């Protein structure tokens, strides 16, 4: 999956803005190229996990369809931990058709990786930043 630089900048800024709470959203695009980020409120307001509101997920899907885009990944930040899936991330990654992108802000160093997860196991990792 290729993430346009402008999208990477947007999610970095959103993650910094929301810290220390985990920030989250969806990555939208076509043909494995991400062209937009769709931010969603972390309704858990937690520093260690996130949840999307069902109404926000529906709105995101409706928006993507209106633009002719697909949901290619969901993304969230790890304000104080590495850019790798936690046990909870692996447990909740239930769609093998999308990637799971994690942006780390640990120690002021930014890292963005995305993962394919199948049956609770990482089966593919891509480093983006």
Would you name each region that the model predicts?
Residues 1-71, 80-129:
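Conserved beta-strand-loop surface patch within small alpha/beta domains used
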Residues 77:
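Residue-level "edge-of-site" marker
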């Amino acid at each position: 999956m290729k993430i346009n630089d402008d999208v990477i900048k947007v999610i970095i800024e959103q993650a910094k803005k929301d810290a220390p709470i985990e920030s989250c959203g969806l990555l939208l695009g076509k043909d494995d190229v991400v062209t937009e980020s769709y931010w969603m409120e972390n309704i858990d307001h937690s520093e260690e996990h996130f949840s999307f509101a069902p109404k926000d997920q529906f709105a995101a899907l409706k928006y993507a369809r209106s633009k002719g885009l697909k949901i290619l990944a969901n993304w969230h930040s790890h304000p104080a931990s590495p850019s790798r899936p936690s046990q909870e991330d692996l447990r909740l990654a239930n769609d093998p058709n999308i990637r799971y992108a994690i942006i780390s802000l640990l120690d002021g160093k930014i890292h963005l990786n995305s993962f394919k997860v199948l049956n609770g196991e990482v089966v593919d990792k891509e480093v983006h930043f």
